[in-house]
Structures are given as C-alpha cells and as structure tokens.
Amino acid sequence: MYRYETHLHTSPVSACARKTVRENLEFYRDIGYAGVFITNHFLDGNFAARNDESMSYEDKIRFYCSDFEEGEKLAKEIGIDVFFGVELSYKGTDFLVYGLGKDWFLSHPEIMDMKKSDELRFMTSEGAFIVQAHPFREKSYIDHVRLFPRCVHGVEVINASLGEFENRMADYYAGAYGLCRTAGSDNHSAGNAKRLAGVEFETPLRDVADYAARVRAGEGRLFTVDRTEEAVSMRRD
C-alpha cells in the first residue's frame, strides 16, 4: 500500500510549524510513506508573513509557495512524492484546498476580500477539491463550530491531533451530508508527533487531481499510526 500525509505544516511558511521541509520529508520517507501534501496556513491564517505590510499580495504568495517548491526540489533526492495544497482559515474554521497552484493564486488576489463561502464556491468552480479540516475542533480562540456542507467536497473525519469525540462527530457530519471522508495528521512537528493519520492506496498517486478523483470515488483507506506504542491501527476500510 502507498501511504500519504494529507495535512502537513512546514517551517518557515506556517508560523506554528516547528520542522523544515527537509526534516518532514526525511521523517515521512523513513517511516515508509509514499508522499506528502504540504498544506501550510494560507494568508488568511497562521501564515508567517501575514502581518508584514512591506510585502505585496504577490510577494506573500511567492513566499507561501516557497516551502512547497523546496519540497519539489528535494523530492527525488529524498525519495518521496510531494504535492501542493493550501489550508484556508476563517475564525478558526479551516479548509484544505487541493488542485490550485501558484499561478492561480497569483492571478486571483480578489479572494482575500471574498466572503468565505463565496471563496470556497469560486475555488470549486475553478477546479479545486475542498475538504473541511477538523470541523468539530474546540479551542479557546474558536468562538463556535461552523459547518460548510454545501461548500466542500469532503470532511477530515480523522485528524490525528484531535480526540475520538471530535473525529466521531466529523464522521457523522460527513455521513449525514454524503461527503467524502479523508484523514490527516495536521502535523506541525514531523517526528515529534505522537499520532499520525492519512490515506493509503493500492497504487501510487499520479498527481493532485488523481488524489481528488480517487477520494471522490471512495477509493483509498484511512489509517492512523500510534507512534507512542509504535503500532499501526487501521481505522476505516
């Protein structure tokens, strides 16, 4: 089976990430993963240059994409596939966006002024595959749970950083609305993470579009890895 990390943050682009691109790629290669999706916090979230007024929108996008571009360059050397994704944010409610690239974001600065639901619908119309990340996460900075079932294709029903209750509610949400199910680690610290989650397939992914198509077709299996016990637990077939 070919395992993939679908939700990963790297330093320096994500302000809260603790490990570099190289450190992450080497970690995932060493534990047998076939690939990772780098999904750093976008300009509307915990992006390292979010409040840098000296940078234009275009400059911020170029910096934002720099971690992924580094990953692309390192991929062959390290021996792991690297794919591009984005994590959008709205008051602590987050969305994983796959299928749009650097040129697209450079061409659409207007997204920064859009209402979030309009932004998600626009991205969908442009070919994006969108997953609501950890929809039932509760934190002090999140005023209340917000659901966007009409604006997303899928739900992250296993987030390795959350507990059973929050993930179970996410799974119910996906089932109630007939949305795709995904899993991811939301990893900010590479090998320091105590638990991982992802999606595995019988054959390797060709590209991001292939990932989206397979998930929408119900292919792939969600898994978790409990690193505290060095055990692997298959959570969904």
Task: Show where each model-derived region lies.
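Mobile, glycine- and charge-enriched loop segments
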Residues: 1-16, 120-127
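Charged catalytic cores and adjacent phosphate/nucleic-acid-binding surfaces used
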Residues: 1-6, 10-11, 21-26, 91-104, ...
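Active-site flanking residues adjacent to catalytic metal/cofactor-binding acidic residues
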Residues: 6, 39, 86, 133, ...
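Ser/Thr-glycine-rich phosphate-binding loops at phosphate-binding pockets of nucleotides
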Residues: 10-11, 35-40, 44
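Short, solvent-exposed loop/turn segments at secondary-structure boundaries
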Residues: 14-19, 107-110
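Catalytic domains of carbohydrate-active enzymes, especially glycoside hydrolases
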Residues: 23-39
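A short helix->loop->beta-strand "cap" motif at the edges of active sites that frequently abuts
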Residues: 33, 80, 177-179
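Extended substrate/RNA-proximal surfaces in nucleic-acid metabolism proteins
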Residues: 42-156, 161-162, 216, 220-224
